[in-house]
């Protein structure tokens, strides 16, 4: 019986450690209104789980701050969106995460909502790879 409990605890520990906050490859839709269509690009972003807790009894004197998996370091890359009008700026700059950590959500630079539009959302019907 003790070996079963040990195996269970070990599997739980392994699941938590292996699903930590880390870089992951994602595909995002890039669009420029002047170009009237979207392109898909590959980039890296942070994904995974962070230790957090939600208290049953809320204490107004002690705010409940949830940690999220977010970027620690960013670089920016630029891509040219094809098909833009000659007078339009066809360059699009997007963030690429280079390091991740568990921290507070910075609403100035991150969509902190429960459900955002998602990285593959496109306002236009046409998507180019």
From Swiss-Prot:
Name recorded for this polypeptide: Follitropin subunit beta
Function: Together with the alpha chain CGA constitutes follitropin, the follicle-stimulating hormone, and provides its biological specificity to the hormone heterodimer. Binds FSHR, a G protein-coupled receptor, on target cells to activate downstream signaling pathways. Follitropin is involved in follicle development and spermatogenesis in reproductive organs.
GO terms of biological process kind: follicle-stimulating hormone signaling pathway; G protein-coupled receptor signaling pathway; positive regulation of bone resorption; positive regulation of gene expression; positive regulation of steroid biosynthetic process; regulation of osteoclast differentiation; regulation of signaling receptor activity; Sertoli cell proliferation
Keywords: Disulfide bond, Glycoprotein, Hormone, Secreted, Signal
Lineage, highest ranks first: Eukaryota, Metazoa, Chordata, Craniata, Vertebrata
Broad class of the protein's primary localization: secreted
Assembly mode: Heterodimer. The active follitropin is a heterodimer composed of an alpha chain/CGA shared with other hormones and a unique beta chain/FSHB shown here.
Keyword Signal: yes
GO cellular component, one term: extracellular space
Keyword ATP-binding: no
Disulfide bridges in this chain: 21-69, 35-84, 38-122, 46-100, 50-102, 105-112
Organism of this sequence: Oryctolagus cuniculus
